[in-house]
């Protein structure tokens, strides 16, 4: 019985008890005196009538006394019963108060052990419907769950422990195909070209994680896949999980292969994803890491269009930073991050130069830059180019909506 229901019942009982007590008091103080005061009016009717009246009075008083005593006994019995019930309810409430916290602890402990209780995102539920056989659960590794300090200077849990917290259902079948590294990498890259197959690409990498976790070409692709899962997920806790695990794997990758541009690229991107869930200090910290490793990746992969797109986004964001955010960054790193809309535009146009029609989002940002610079004609041009591109990813869909908003503002 809920606590509020007990409380209402107790109040009702107390009100009822008070009502009965008032009834008894009313009888003693008002009703009984009135009965005795009526009798003297009949004394003036003569001796005979006086005698009869006195007899009637005596009989009436005795009868009333008996009835009243019986009524009192019944009331006392009811009161005693009510008081007993009140005491029982008090004991029950006390028991519930002591039990509920223990029950909550038990539930938390149970959830801590049975991680499969995790709520699956809509994408995962859709995939589950396609599965016709029982999901094969990968064996848990015996790695320690101790925490390690990340390159960014704050604490992140070890990767293996975190990865087990969010099991991913098989998209197609439960058979784990044992592939050679080169065949696996080709298949993963091919699957990832299609937005609908990115989850399968991620699963394939996870299935071979124990076998190829020391291979750098495998590792940076796994980091990239965690970034893909971040994009696919609609659940905030899942997105946070994929971002943190991917960032931790990315740190491992850049440590083992500091001259591999792809390691720096995808580590930088995961730092950006993690920053979405951080406070101002860690957000700025992640932004610093993002810029640092993006610049390294550009030096190592100067012809990779995605790098210039990401740098353009960084420059555009920094150009919009508030004074307090810049001051905080200066306090943390000794320098104020600075960039301009012109610098952002240069990087977005470089992306277009390396790969024309790179994405709806790239055109959208070019249009935004031109709007900020007061060049409406150029903004119109790139908005129209953006509308011509197909909508493939969620990012494309969001960018398409933003383009329509820009067009609306240009029409005013």
UniProtKB/Swiss-Prot annotation:
<feature type="modified residue" description="Phosphothreonine">
    <location>
        <position position="159"/>
    </location>
</feature>
<keyword id="KW-0206">Cytoskeleton</keyword>
<dbReference type="GO" id="GO:0016020">
    <property type="term" value="C:membrane"/>
</dbReference>
<dbReference type="GO" id="GO:0097431">
    <property type="term" value="C:mitotic spindle pole"/>
</dbReference>
<dbReference type="InterPro" id="IPR011990">
    <property type="entry name" value="TPR-like_helical_dom_sf"/>
</dbReference>
<comment type="similarity">
    <text>Belongs to the RMDN family.</text>
</comment>
<protein>
    <recommendedName>
        <fullName>Regulator of microtubule dynamics protein 2</fullName>
    </recommendedName>
</protein>
<keyword id="KW-0812">Transmembrane</keyword>
<keyword id="KW-0175">Coiled coil</keyword>
<feature type="modified residue" description="Phosphoserine">
    <location>
        <position position="121"/>
    </location>
</feature>
<feature type="transmembrane region" description="Helical">
    <location>
        <begin position="9"/>
        <end position="28"/>
    </location>
</feature>
<dbReference type="Pfam" id="PF21033">
    <property type="entry name" value="RMD1-3"/>
</dbReference>
<feature type="modified residue" description="Phosphothreonine">
    <location>
        <position position="156"/>
    </location>
</feature>
<dbReference type="InterPro" id="IPR049039">
    <property type="entry name" value="RMD1-3_a_helical_rpt"/>
</dbReference>
<feature type="modified residue" description="Phosphothreonine">
    <location>
        <position position="141"/>
    </location>
</feature>
<dbReference type="GO" id="GO:0005739">
    <property type="term" value="C:mitochondrion"/>
</dbReference>
<keyword id="KW-1133">Transmembrane helix</keyword>
<keyword id="KW-0493">Microtubule</keyword>
<comment type="subunit">
    <text>Interacts with microtubules.</text>
</comment>
<keyword id="KW-0472">Membrane</keyword>
<feature type="modified residue" description="Phosphoserine">
    <location>
        <position position="51"/>
    </location>
</feature>
<dbReference type="GO" id="GO:0008017">
    <property type="term" value="F:microtubule binding"/>
</dbReference>
<feature type="modified residue" description="Phosphotyrosine">
    <location>
        <position position="154"/>
    </location>
</feature>
<dbReference type="GO" id="GO:0005876">
    <property type="term" value="C:spindle microtubule"/>
</dbReference>
<feature type="coiled-coil region">
    <location>
        <begin position="72"/>
        <end position="110"/>
    </location>
</feature>
<dbReference type="GO" id="GO:0005737">
    <property type="term" value="C:cytoplasm"/>
</dbReference>
<keyword id="KW-0963">Cytoplasm</keyword>
<keyword id="KW-0597">Phosphoprotein</keyword>
<feature type="region of interest" description="Disordered">
    <location>
        <begin position="122"/>
        <end position="153"/>
    </location>
</feature>
């Amino acid at each position: 019985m809920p606590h509020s229901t007990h409380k209402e019942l107790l109040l009702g009982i107390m009100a009822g008890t008070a009502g009965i007590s008032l009834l008894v008091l009313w009888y003693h103080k008002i009703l009984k005196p009135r009965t005795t005061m009526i009798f003297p009016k009949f004394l003036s009717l003569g001796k005979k009538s006086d005698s009869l009246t006195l007899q009637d009075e005596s009989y009436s008083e005795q009868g009333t006394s008996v009835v009243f005593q019986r009524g009192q006994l019944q009331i006392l019995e009811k009161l005693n019963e009510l008081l007993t019930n009140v005491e029982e309810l008090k004991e029950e409430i006390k028991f519930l108060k002591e039990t509920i916290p223990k029950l909550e602890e038990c539930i938390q402990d149970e959830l801590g052990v049975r991680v499969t209780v995790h709520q699956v995102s809509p994408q995962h539920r859709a995939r589950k419907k396609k599965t016709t056989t029982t999901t094969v659960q990968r064996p848990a590794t015996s790695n320690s769950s101790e925490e390690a300090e990340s390159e960014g200077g704050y604490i992140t849990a070890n990767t293996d422990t975190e990865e087990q917290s969010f099991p991913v259902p098989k998209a197609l079948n439960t058979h784990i195909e044992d592939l050679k590294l080169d065949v696996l990498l080709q298949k993963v890259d091919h699957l990832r070209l299609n937005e609908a197959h990115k989850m399968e690409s991620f699963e394939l990498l996870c299935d071979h994680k124990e076998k190829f976790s020391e291979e750098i070409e495998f590792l940076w692709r796994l980091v990239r896949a965690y970034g893909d899962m971040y994009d696919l997920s609609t659940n905030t806790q899942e997105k946070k999980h994929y971002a943190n695990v991917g960032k931790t794997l990315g740190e491992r990758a850049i440590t083992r292969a500091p001259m591999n541009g792809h390691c720096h690229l995808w580590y930088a991107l995961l730092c950006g994803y993690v920053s979405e869930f951080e406070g101002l200090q860690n957000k700025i910290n992640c932004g610093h890491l993002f810029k640092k490793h993006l610049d390294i990746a550009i030096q190592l992969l100067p012809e990779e269009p995605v790098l210039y797109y990401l740098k353009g986004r960084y420059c555009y964001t920094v150009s919009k930073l508030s004074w307090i955010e810049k001051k905080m960054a200066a306090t943390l790193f000794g320098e104020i991050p600075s960039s301009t809309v012109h610098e952002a535009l240069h990087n977005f146009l470089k992306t277009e130069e390396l790969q024309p029609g790179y994405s709806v989002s790239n055109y959208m940002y070019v249009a935004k830059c031109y709007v900020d610079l007061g060049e409406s004609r150029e903004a119109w041009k790139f908005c129209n180019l953006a509308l011509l591109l197909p909508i493939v990813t969620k990012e494309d869909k969001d960018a398409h909506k933003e383009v329509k908003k820009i067009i609306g503002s240009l029409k005013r």
